[in-house]
Amino acid sequence: MRKPNVILRKCGEYNPDAIRGIIDDSIRDLGLTINGSVFIKPNVVSANKRYIDSSYTNPLVVEGMVGSLKDRGVRDIVIGESGGYGIPSRLFLKEAGYFDLSKKTGVPVIDLNEHAQEKIDLTKGVWH
């Protein structure tokens, strides 16, 4: 079995352009081709900018990722989360700034607990 590749890069600030560059370099270094639909699941455990501002992925990171994907011609992008506290994830997504990001980028943001689900058989799926 092939060992997985892991890329670690330093980013000194939450700057979407710098993050986009790191993601671009990483995609190139891994030899990836990205096409089709892309689902981005940031980690939004909770969000409270006053008390626990480090319990979610900063939306600027996701903005950089969205920019990189759009640069590659990906147009079907969705951001979604399903929190585990019993509190609607949309509240955390809003507090964290993901709905503002959606307005800025045109990428929809969904709460997976409130969104319609559909079973899809992956006929060409491969276990990694």
Regions found by a protein language model. Give the residues of each.
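N-terminal and secondary-structure boundary signal
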Residues: 1-128
